[in-house]
């Protein structure tokens, strides 16, 4: 029993399997466009019928639920691959059900909502321009992005595989009072043409505790939306279905709910039990494909 890890030069072989995804397209396509790092495992290196796309935060799974070797690989969760695992998102319902069946109580289903901005530009005017309480909006540079991650517990450097990639392919804005960062809205992922002729940029939002409910997030988000509109991008927003505060802010800013989806994560987001020594890795072949073989056989 074996699975195949594709080199980036062959990622395109797995791309058609993810075309059915209606969620997190910026996260998925960003890997195929080499904007963010990722790894792709398939059941067949020439004509894959199922694929696992691993990137920081979510692991995306597409294709047929009948790919037994890939399902075994996922169930075992080799430590060499699953260090960044946060949760699975499957691109079709039969595959999601298969993953739940394989993992049993090790995973729980988390309902998620996806939004896309489709609001009135003029309705955001109140969040543009000078602020009476001295709040300024600045675009994130490297120093501010590093401070944002460090001081507000954000993950731009993690999502993008480093700040160089974030600055080259992503963007974001922060609100400040003096030199203190009070709120942020930044791209967790960006991808090219995918929705109605536009690209997508998925927003991550945070306000420092002492400054919440004072419009700081709305100002940073407005700058983010304006940047998206100027660069042919649709701003998208994801949140857990029970996060009412996030949903209320999204709707207030003009985001409209898209199709819901599900994330499969461990209870309490505790670390996944990882396998050691169950899969052997062969040297890459001439095309750069790496074969992973189960030591337990078929």
Question: What positions do the PLM features span?
Answer:
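Short amphipathic alpha-helix that is part of the acyltransferase structural core
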Residues: 1-24, 121-161, 277-295
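Active-site rim helix/loop that mediates acceptor-substrate recognition in acyltransferases
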Residues: 23-36, 153-174
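Acyl-donor-binding surface of acyltransferase catalytic domains
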Residues: 37-147
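Conserved acetyl-CoA-binding loop-helix of GNAT-fold acetyltransferases
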Residues: 68-75, 203, 207, 213-228, ...
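Conserved active-site alpha-helix within GNAT-family acetyltransferase domains
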Residues: 94-106, 218, 241-259
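Conserved catalytic-core motifs of GNAT/GCN5-like acyltransferases
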Residues: 108-119, 256-273, 279-283
């Amino acid at each position: 029993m074996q699975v195949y890890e594709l080199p980036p030069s062959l990622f395109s072989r797995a791309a058609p399997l993810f075309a059915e995804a209606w969620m997190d397209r910026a996260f998925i396509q960003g890997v195929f466009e080499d904007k963010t790092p990722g790894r792709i495992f398939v059941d067949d290196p020439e004509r894959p019928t199922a694929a696992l796309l691993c990137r920081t935060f979510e692991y995306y799974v597409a294709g047929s639920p009948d790919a037994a070797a890939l399902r075994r690989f996922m169930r075992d969760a080799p430590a060499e691959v699953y260090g960044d695992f946060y949760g699975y998102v499957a691109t079709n319902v039969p595959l999601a059900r298969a993953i739940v069946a394989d993992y049993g109580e090790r995973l729980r289903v988390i309902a998620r909502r996806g939004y896309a901005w489709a609001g009135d530009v003029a309705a955001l005017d109140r969040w543009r321009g000078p602020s009476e309480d001295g709040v300024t909006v600045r675009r994130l540079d490297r120093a501010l992005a590093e401070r944002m991650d460090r001081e507000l517990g954000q993950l731009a450097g993690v999502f993008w595989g480093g700040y160089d990639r974030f600055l080259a392919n992503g963007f974001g804005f922060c609100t400040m009072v003096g030199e203190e960062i009070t709120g942020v809205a930044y791209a967790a992922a960006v991808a090219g043409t995918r929705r109605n002729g536009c690209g997508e940029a998925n927003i991550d939002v945070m306000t420092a505790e002492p400054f919440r409910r004072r419009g700081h997030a709305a100002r940073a988000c407005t700058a983010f939306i304006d940047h998206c509109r100027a660069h042919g991008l649709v701003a998208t927003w994801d949140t857990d279905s029970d996060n009412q505060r996030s949903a209320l802010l999204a709707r207030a800013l003009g985001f409209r709910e898209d199709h819901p989806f599900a994330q499969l994560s461990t209870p309490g987001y505790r670390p996944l039990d990882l396998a050691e020594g169950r899969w052997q890795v062969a040297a890459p072949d001439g095309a750069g494909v790496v074969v992973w073989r189960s030591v337990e056989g078929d």
